[in-house]
Design a protein with these regions (language model features):
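N-terminal secretory targeting modules
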Residues: 1-62, 66-89, 118-123, 233-288
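Short hydrophobic segments within beta-strands
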Residues: 62-63, 94, 167
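Short strand->helix junction
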Residues: 65-67, 98-101
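Alpha-helical cap/lid subdomain in secreted, periplasmic
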Residues: 74-90, 99, 103-249
């Protein structure tokens, strides 16, 4: 069995290039598709739509046990199969229980990118780490940014046109922060990454908090940290609203004038070049 360890980025990560140019996500128009669902960079979803209509498509899901479980993920897979009945999908479940965004940055090359056709990365990518960065990693803002930004930079380096959906799932501490008028640290960090790279977001934590406070549902009905079928259906409905919206009218690459030679990372120490090495090849001495 291969023995592995971590290597991380201590400098700017890989460039997010499309035909030699890079799109600045922060300059892209954004809009609220539905309550707590934000659409950014619809062009990338149009690219995914074209790929799916060609007959093939790579769709990947990265996260913790919420992704790994039989929950929202298979619901979205069924939605896509119904929407594109002639398409041969390669669905990738890269959820691993109790893992956070930092480990996600190390895993994404092997567990997602290399499992796609030609090792070129997914056409459509879903990622969630808000809950685990909060309750498992107890990450501060810097740690959450570095992990999630590392994931995004690795995906975009592999496939610059990947359409990405970032999902903020719910736990009680996250909802309590919203009730106190604050934005939870992990969601604040991941939102900063989403805004910087023009990534669409689905804020389940905020949606659920508002619905509970309005008396429309309960935490028990939703199903706790690992949602029950009804809770996962709520999440899938939010994602499907986003996808229905961005695929209703094809978007053109009208933002090409905003492209530049590079997008600087939010944090130069984010894990944009993170990966695995064999223990036998790892350098254990000589550091200064």
């Amino acid at each position: 069995m291969l023995r592995r360890t971590f290597i991380g980025a201590l400098s700017a990560g890989a460039l997010l290039m499309t035909n030699g140019m890079i799109l600045k996500g922060a300059d892209a128009p954004a809009g609220e598709v539905a309550k707590n669902v934000i659409r950014r960079q619809p062009y990338y979803f149009t690219v995914a739509d074209r790929k799916f209509r060609s007959g093939k498509g790579d769709v990947a899901f990265l996260g913790g046990s919420i992704t790994e479980m039989d929950g929202y993920r298979p619901m979205i897979c069924e939605y896509l199969k119904k929407k594109y009945p002639q398409t041969q999908f390669n669905f990738i479940d890269a959820g691993v229980s109790s893992t956070c965004s930092n480990l996600g940055a190390f895993r994404v090359e092997e567990d997602v990118i290399q499992r796609c056709e030609g090792g070129k990365g997914p056409d459509l990518f879903f990622v969630e780490y808000a809950v685990n960065d909060n309750q498992d990693g107890f990450f501060n803002l810097e740690q959450s940014i570095r992990g999630m930004e590392g994931v995004i930079r690795r995906i975009k380096a592999a496939n610059p046109d990947a359409a990405i959906v970032m999902i903020f799932f719910a736990n009680i501490p996250l909802m309590e922060k919203y009730r106190a008028g604050e934005v939870p640290t992990s969601i604040q960090a991941h939102t900063a990454v989403a805004e910087h790279y023009g990534i669409s977001t689905v804020n389940v934590a905020k949606e659920l908090q508002e619905e509970i406070d309005a008396g429309n549902t309960t935490w028990e009905i939703y199903g706790d940290v690992h949602p029950a079928p009804q809770g996962n259906r709520m999440v899938a409905d939010m994602i499907e609203k986003l996808l229905d919206y961005v695929w209703r009218v094809p978007a053109t690459c009208s933002l090409c004038a905003l492209r530049s030679s590079e997008v600087e990372p939010l944090d130069p120490y984010s894990y944009g070049t993170a990966g695995w090495v064999d223990f036998d090849a790892a350098q254990t001495e000589g550091f200064t």
